[in-house]
Amino acid sequence: MAKAGNIERVVERADTELMPPSMYKVILNNDDYTPMDFVVEVLQLFFKMNEHQATEIMLQIHHQGKAVCGVFPFGIAETKVAQVNQFARQNQHPLLCSLEKA
């Protein structure tokens, strides 16, 4: 309500506690056709790994069938999955990137 040019303000304080966002693992899955050097390139390009890190993860994918490339909030994880899958298709590779709740 206004009183002689003064404005009365009501400020409500929320009694809710902020929760951290749910985190998701971004996973690369092995296949029999995608070249190893392409997987290393993907890891460097989309997950900012150096060559040594990318090679280690690529070998884990090759030997264990899949590997976690990073853990991110849902929106970032979803974007990385879409970017990797699109990049793989553009380069005619069946490489599959997926996500699961951490």
Curated annotation (Swiss-Prot):
GO biological process: protein catabolic process; proteolysis
Cited Gene3D superfamilies: 3.30.1390.10
Any Pfam family the entry gives: ClpS
Subunit structure as annotated in this protein's UniProt entry: Binds to the N-terminal domain of the chaperone ClpA.
Function, as annotated: Involved in the modulation of the specificity of the ClpAP-mediated ATP-dependent protein degradation.
Family: Belongs to the ClpS family.
Protein name per the record: ATP-dependent Clp protease adapter protein ClpS
Protein species of origin: Shewanella amazonensis (strain ATCC BAA-1098 / SB2B)
